[in-house]
Regions:
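Juxtamembrane helix-capping/reentrant segments at transmembrane boundaries
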Residues: 28-42, 94-106
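Membrane-interfacial helix termini and the short, flexible loops that connect transmembrane helices
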Residues: 18, 88-96, 270
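N-terminal amphipathic, basic-rich helices that act as targeting or association modules
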Residues: 83-86
Length: 390
């Protein structure tokens, strides 16, 4: 609630201040956005609202000695700074912004720091389920082990759903544990880069990224809560992660900040989050999933982000294949995928060969955003259901 109030209160003054200094969106593609002219001049860098509204309650109410809280705060500030620099360059130096290689290096560096911290910190531990049989009554008893360092992760929709990365390298003998942790660190780096970039691609319509991210944040808060509660973790037969209750505090602040920001970002937007918001939003979601050992659930929880990223990759590769043959090939009418739904008839040049020419017609921006939210709600519910359905 505090983050929601801060976001809504600070947001109105931030928007006025940005308008007074003419710090606004200047580049809009009106060919695919019928409201592009109206959006020109809308303040950007609104991610600052999200960052402040998330950080202030956590600094006031969170346990700042908790390793997971520190990782979340660090992720927010780190990616927020990268996004801020990118937005600043776009507005003042070059419309292309920060060079992609620099952004990727920044994201990869954060991923390595997160992975190595979870590997080396004595506070980042789990308590696994141990099953024993009472000899007198043949009763099956499930209890928790002592805190241990582990590369175990959860495989969704599988009955015996724990996988240790170290077991993948069992052929290495005594080196398998080290190999498992190295693989884990690389996995963390990839996940942080993938989800933060997916979030960045999803930030293309009013309310799109903020709404989807709030839904994902709620799902992760539920998963973090059951992982932090020893009784619930035992009942659901999942890993108990001591200290992860601080993630719940952080995520509730995060969701509140997003909802407050959405008050101003909903169609028609009064402010855009920019890379200052979209990069840390994706990073927060990624790091949370990693900490609670649910990184393999990311394709489910972040399905919308995944679809956006895959659509861009497919579009780029297919276009390059066509260029080699002197042809204009496209998989979708536009990419990221959300742009394909708002292309008007006749906007695609006649010499373009579209592989998936769908949908027919043009959807309103508000309808596209709402339907993407619905998809996110369905996938978030599916992720939560995996706690029981295996």
């Amino acid at each position: 609630m505090l983050s929601l109030l801060i976001s809504m209160w600070f947001g109105q003054y931030f928007i006025k201040w940005m308008k007074m200094r003419n710090i606004s969106e200047t580049q809009r593609d009106a060919s695919i956005d019928p409201y592009g002219v109206d959006k020109k001049g809308v303040p950007t860098m609104g991610g600052i609202i999200i960052l402040i509204a998330t950080l202030v309650p956590c600094l006031l109410l969170g346990r700042l000695r908790n390793i997971y809280m520190l990782l979340m705060l660090g992720t927010t500030v780190w990616l927020g700074l990268i996004g801020f620099v990118d937005d600043y360059i776009k507005m003042n130096i070059s419309k292309d912004g920060l060079r992609p290689i620099y952004k990727l290096v920044g994201q990869a560096s954060l991923g390595l720091i997160i992975g190595l911290t979870l590997w080396l910190s004595p506070d980042a531990v789990i308590r696994e389920n141990i099953t024993t049989i009472n000899k007198g009554t043949t009763e099956v008893v499930i209890h928790k082990s002592e805190p241990v360092k582990s590369t175990i992760t959860t495989i969704p929709f599988v009955k015996n759903n724990n996988l240790s990365y170290s077991n993948i390298f069992s052929f290495l003998g005594r080196y398998r544990t080290a190999a498992g942790w190295i693989f884990f660190v690389l996995m963390v780096t990839f996940v942080v880069m993938a989800v933060s970039n997916g979030s960045n691609l999803n930030d293309g319509m009013d309310g799109m990224c903020a709404g989807n991210s709030a839904i994902m944040g709620i799902a992760l808060a539920i998963l973090a809560y059951v992982s932090s509660h020893i009784a619930l973790a035992s009942y659901l037969n999942i890993m108990y992660i001591p200290g992860s209750e601080e993630l719940v505090i952080f995520l509730l602040a995060f969701v509140g900040a997003l909802v407050g920001f959405l008050w101003y970002n909903a169609y028609p937007a009064q402010v855009f989050m920019g890379d200052t918001g979209s990069l840390p939003v994706g990073g927060i979601i990624a790091v949370t999933a990693i900490i609670i050992h649910k990184e393999l659930l990311i394709p489910v929880i972040c399905f919308v982000f995944l679809a956006e990223s895959v659509s861009v990759i497919l579009q780029t590769r297919y276009a390059k294949m066509g260029n080699r043959r002197g042809l204009k090939w496209r998989v979708f009418k536009r990419a990221p995928i959300h742009d394909a739904f708002r292309v008007k008839p006749g906007q695609i040049p006649s010499d373009f060969k579209i592989l998936l020419n769908w949908p027919h017609g043009c959807w309103l921006e508000s309808k596209i955003t709402t339907r993407f939210w619905i998809v996110s709600i369905i996938m978030a519910a599916l992720a939560i259901v995996t706690l029981k359905i295996r």
